[in-house]
Amino acid sequence: MNVKVNGDFREIPDGETVRALVARYNLKPEKVAIELNRRLVRSEKYDTALNDGDEIEIVTFVGGG
């Protein structure tokens, strides 16, 4: 199925979850914010299955000062 991740179309397996997508990009769940179809996904909902045409934004937190 096809989804849009940070503005780019990507093909992912059917039934992939938010958690699996985070793992696919080797991201640490505690260091990212995920938006699915313009709604923030709380970490306890990362087992939500993605659907064809979904739009995902991944924001990575970085420290600095």
Locate predicted features.
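Ubiquitin-like/PB1-type beta-grasp interaction modules and other compact soluble beta-rich domains
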Residues: M1-G64
